[in-house]
């Protein structure tokens, strides 16, 4: 009888081999898992990259499509026949207006159905088709680019808190400028006309322009700033045209404030015999300004601020009530006002303890607000020159001596000067 084969290995050895086989299989499975995970991550990365490329290409396609549409519209406009430019004289009914076309004359024309009749008023610039003379487009007002530049786009950051020693002036300008713009019903209830213009006059450096900037900051309206010298032009009639367009722009962007600095350059008193064509042109500009201030169409949404340091040479026709309703004087600050101004300009400075600003204010008798600000700046420059990060009393004293230009001997010590 044949012997049956028996496994002669020990049970421990068989179990070890079985465990080794299972461990090898587990390692192989773990390796395959890591391989496929890396492969999945790589595919996901490629998918994200392809998605980003697709989004970028779609954005480029949309941009190119928009450019194509814009160019097609521009090409269509270029292929259209030209139009006549006219000015509306009178609205006649629901679909007809009387238009003046220079130099041909006046015509009664039809209005295109796409035009809103409520937007058409006298003096509106319009476009007429050259074949049928149908009004098909309302044009914006023609304003000189130089006049457009006078409109201040960014609201000034000056506030009333930055102005010292002018409490009475601030109160008066609020009554004339801010109150009519923010609460016009108060004037209507009293039955009085709103003030049109304000004249700020006083020595240079007393805060006239600074207060005008603060008014623009606190009133939510368009601020137009123009210097009187900008309205003096070389050719006859140019200055008058700029004044007209200035008020046209103010009416379009109402409520608005027109600030005319150095008004004495065009508003000086008229003489019987001028010295030349230059004076005559300046007088024409002033006459146009007077006409605009009177205004055949009085607007309560336009306020005029004027500033000058030579009120004595201004024409009396400009100063009469109805054109300039309030005149606000800006004198040099007194001792208390000088102290307030010094506190305002030095509150951001790194000062040493014990600085006596009241003593500085006492020594600057007759100084203007601009000179007080210059003293604070010069004191900081003296500290900077000594490589210090703080300002001392001596820095202020030297700054006062420099700004005020004391008539003293050069070798005189500062201690003797301030005794």
UniProtKB/Swiss-Prot annotation:
Keywords: Acetylation, ATP-binding, Cytoplasm, Isopeptide bond, Nucleotide-binding, Nucleus, Proteasome, Ubl conjugation. The modification N-acetylalanine is found at residue 2. Pfam families: AAA, AAA_lid_3, Prot_ATP_ID_OB_C. InterPro entries: 26S_Proteasome_ATPase, AAA+_ATPase, AAA_lid_3, ATPase_AAA_core, ATPase_AAA_CS, NA-bd_OB-fold, P-loop_NTPase, Prot_ATP_ID_OB_2nd. SUPFAM superfamilies: P-loop containing nucleoside triphosphate hydrolases. There is a cross-link at residue 406 (Glycyl lysine isopeptide (Lys-Gly) (interchain with G-Cter in ubiquitin)). ATP binds at residues 202-209. GO terms for cellular component: nucleus; plastid; proteasome complex. CDD domains: RecA-like_PAN_like (cd19502). The 26S proteasome is involved in the ATP-dependent degradation of ubiquitinated proteins. The regulatory (or ATPase) complex confers ATP dependency and substrate specificity to the 26S complex. Belongs to the AAA ATPase family. Component of the 19S regulatory particle (RP/PA700) base subcomplex of the 26S proteasome. The 26S proteasome is composed of a core protease (CP), known as the 20S proteasome, capped at one or both ends by the 19S regulatory particle (RP/PA700). The RP/PA700 complex is composed of at least 17 different subunits in two subcomplexes, the base and the lid, which form the portions proximal and distal to the 20S proteolytic core, respectively. This is 26S proteasome regulatory subunit 8 homolog A. It comes from Arabidopsis thaliana. The gene is RPT6A.
């Amino acid at each position: 009888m044949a012997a049956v084969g028996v496994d002669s290995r020990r049970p421990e050895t068989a179990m070890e081999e079985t465990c080794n086989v299972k461990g090898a299989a587990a390692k192989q499975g773990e390796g395959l898992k890591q391989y496929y995970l890396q492969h999945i991550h790589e595919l996901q990365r490629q998918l994200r990259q392809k998605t980003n490329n697709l989004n970028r290409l779609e954005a480029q396609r949309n941009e190119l499509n928009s450019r194509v549409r814009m160019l097609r519209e521009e090409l269509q406009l270029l292929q259209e026949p030209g139009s006549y430019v006219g000015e509306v004289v009178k609205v006649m009914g629901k679909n007809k207006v009387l238009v003046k076309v220079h130099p041909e004359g006046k015509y009664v024309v039809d209005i295109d159905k796409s035009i809103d009749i409520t937007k058409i008023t006298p003096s509106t610039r319009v476009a007429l088709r050259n074949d049928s003379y149908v009004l098909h487009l309302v044009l914006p007002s023609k304003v000189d680019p130089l006049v457009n530049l006078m409109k201040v786009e960014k609201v000034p950051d000056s506030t009333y808190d930055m102005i010292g020693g002018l409490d009475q002036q601030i109160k008066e300008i609020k009554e004339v400028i801010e109150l009519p713009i923010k609460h016009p019903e108060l004037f209507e209830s009293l039955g009085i006309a709103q003030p049109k213009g304000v004249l700020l006059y006083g020595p240079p450096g007393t805060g006239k322009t600074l207060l005008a900037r603060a008014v623009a900051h606190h009133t939510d309206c368009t601020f137009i700033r123009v210097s009187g010298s900008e309205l003096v032009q070389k050719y006859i009639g140019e200055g008058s045209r700029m004044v007209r367009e200035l008020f046209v722009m103010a009416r379009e962007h109402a409520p608005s404030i027109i600030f005319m600095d150095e008004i004495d350059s065009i508003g000086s008193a008229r003489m019987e015999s001028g010295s030349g064509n230059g004076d005559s042109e300046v007088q024409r500009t002033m006459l146009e300004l007077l006409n605009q201030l009177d205004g055949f169409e009085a607007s309560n949404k336009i306020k005029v601020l004027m500033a000058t340091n030579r009120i004595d040479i201004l024409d009396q026709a400009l100063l009469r009530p109805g054109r300039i309703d309030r005149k606000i004087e800006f004198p040099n600050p007194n001792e208390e006002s000088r102290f307030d101004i010094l506190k305002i300009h030095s509150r951001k400075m790194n000062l040493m303890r014990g600085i006596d600003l009241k003593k500085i204010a006492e020594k600057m008798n007759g100084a203007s607000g601009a000179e007080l600000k210059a003293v604070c700046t010069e004191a900081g420059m003296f500290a900077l020159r000594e490589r210090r990060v703080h300002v001392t009393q001596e820095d202020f004293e030297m700054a006062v001596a420099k700004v005020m230009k004391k008539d003293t001997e050069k070798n005189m010590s500062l201690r003797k000067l301030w005794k």
